[in-house]
A protein has these predicted regions:
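Hydrophobic face of alpha-helices
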Residues: 48, 67-74, 85, 103, ...
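Residue-level signal for inorganic ion chemistry
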Residues: 30, 66, 88, 110, ...
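Generic secondary-structure signature for well-ordered alpha-helical cores
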Residues: 53-57, 75-82, 93, 115-119, ...
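Glycine-rich loop-to-alpha-helix module at the N-terminal edge of alpha/beta enzyme cores
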Residues: 31-120, 131
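ALDH superfamily catalytic-core signature
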Residues: 230-333
């Protein structure tokens, strides 16, 4: 399944320099989906040089042309939603209907940023000197390292890649080793949509090794990460040494609050969706429920009744509401 991909560098799919691979597991069957390419230090350096060169091309591309390409990515995602969704279900384990919804959300993000490309406004400020005008012009920050998690690889890769492209930046995307194929398919769509060589790159392999080498480089000017607080702290410390800008979305500890004036049927439906989407492997999945005493019993009964009706199974099977946990580690926890 992964033989058509590999590392995406300078507009081309290529196998890793050392020809190393790692196994990707289907969580529903525990079977090996295939072996994905594992990047070495040589591959990371190639990607950095590629992105540095791609930046010069993309930042000098007009906002209108960038917008056209980004919108084309959204269009192709919708055309190929079944392919992308299948990758998500096979690698993450989520039900196919959830996977299709995630692809739609990712396409919407690209469409939104296609319009934002043309809305990067500067400013004119009043000067203290009578014959002076002060103008503010916004320029691309540079090459972006996008570190993508496994639980929502399409929507979160879309968020990171599309915003970088809208701002005129090139990007090196690192998918999680659990879900490389879904992001590879998305990057291939970027290629087919006309993104110039070197503007979008992908490195697949050991997360710590790739991330550390990217952040050690003077070429990387910004890091975007969605992940755990523990990893976020490590990234923040490394980024500080290079004064790299950082955008972080870390962990979650979400309460679900129910007041006494609610429509209980709607609230119970929302609670089930929030708690069990992607089998609860979501940073905003509720782990605490605060219910006003007057409605507590009613809520508990409604929630339990709906939970009993959820169908557990392989995400590829029609009618499945709850797929497997994605990794053995999560099952053991």
């Amino acid at each position: 399944m992964y033989s058509n991909f590999g590392q995406f560098i300078n507009g081309q799919w290529q196998q890793a320099e050392k020809k190393e691979t790692y196994k990707v597991i289907n969580p529903a069957t525990e079977e090996v989906l295939g072996e994905a390419s594992k990047a070495s230090s040589v591959d990371v350096q190639k990607a950095l040089k590629s992105a540095e060169k791609g930046l010069e091309t993309w930042k000098n591309t007009t906002p209108w042309q960038r917008s056209y390409v980004i919108r084309k990515i959204a269009d192709l995602m919708r055309e190929r939603k079944d392919v992308l969704a299948k990758w998500l279900t096979l690698e993450v384990g989520k039900p196919l209907k959830e996977a299709i919804g995630e692809v739609g959300g990712g396409a919407d993000i690209f469409e939104w940023n296609a319009e934002e490309t043309k809305r990067i406004y500067g400013e004119t400020l009043q000067s203290r000197f009578p014959e002076t005008r002060v103008h503010v012009y916004y320029q691309p920050v540079g090459v972006v390292a996008a570190l993508v998690p496994w639980n929502f690889p399409i929507v979160l890769a879309s968020r990171k890649i599309s915003t970088a492209l809208a701002a005129g930046c090139s990007v090196i995307c690192k998918p999680d080793v659990i879900t490389p194929g879904a992001v590879m398919e998305l990057v291939n769509i970027c290629k087919d949509a006309g993104v110039p060589d070197g503007v979008v790159n992908l490195l697949s392999g050991d997360p710590a090794e790739i991330s550390n080498e990217l952040l050690d480089s003077d070429i990387i000017k910004k890091v975007s990460i969605t992940g755990s607080t523990r990893v976020g702290k490590l990234i923040l410390k490394k980024a500080a040494d290079k004064v790299q800008r950082v955008t972080m979305e870390l962990s979650g500890h979400s309460p679900f609050i129910v007041f006494d004036d609610v429509d209980m049927n709607k609230v119970a439906d929302m609670a089930i969706t929030a708690k069990f989407r992607n089998n609860g492997q979501v940073c905003i999945s509720p782990n605490r429920f605060y219910i006003q005493e007057t409605r507590k019993e009613e809520f508990v009964n409604a929630f339990v009744d709906r939970a009993k009706k959820l169908k557990i199974g392989n995400g590829m099977d029609e009618g499945t509401d709850l797929g497997p946990l994605t990794t053995a580690k999560r099952l053991e926890e």
